[in-house]
Amino acid sequence: MVASMVQQKPIKSAVIVSKVYKRPVSGAIRDIASKLTKLGVKVYLEANTSVGFNIPEIESITRRQMRDLDLIIVVGGDGSVLGAARTLVDLKVPVLGINRGHLGLLTDVNPDNLDESLKKVVKGYYSLEDRTMIDVRVSRDSEDGVGELIGQSLATNETVIHSGTMAHM
């Protein structure tokens, strides 16, 4: 999201989302919130993230309240970004990924460049990328010939259909 310097709307409010409930990520969330606050951004924690990390000094908000914010910041790895994209797509709020995972192919900001990247984004120097999502539906034949829907989900870049235990990277 920070690659090219296209003047966009400056960021005044942001919510931090993470599904990685580990102590180093908790410190990163506090650090990101502190840096954003110093840059004049009102920072919130997504309600589930707030419960998972127990950071009472940052106000928590619900998913519905996120709709009115300027930015969603996902702290974690590629899996966190993919999960957030899938569950928050209907909010129509830009998502910025900050890498705290292993690969970081889908995250926009590396922790080593955090200060400079946040300054640029807050000032409005970022570009937006629309990503295609796949609506995946699985159905099975039924006696009346009409397929019975047994599963449905959105996917950002791929979907896997398997019958058994799935291997993870």
Q: At which residue positions do the language-model features occur?
A:
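Catalytic core of DAGKc-family lipid kinases
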Residues: 105-169
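N-terminal glycine-/serine-/threonine-rich phosphate-binding loop
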Residues: 2-75, 79-89
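Short, acidic/small-residue loops that bind anionic groups at enzyme active sites
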Residues: 91-109
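Short, charged/polar low-complexity linear motifs in solvent-exposed/disordered segments
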Residues: 42, 100, 122-124
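A generic structural signal for short, solvent-exposed coil/turn residues
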Residues: 6-8, 35-37, 87, 97, ...
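Exposed boundary/loop context
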Residues: 69-72, 90, 94-97, 117
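Fold-independent oxyanion-binding glycine-rich loops
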Residues: 18-20, 46-48, 75-78, 98-100, ...
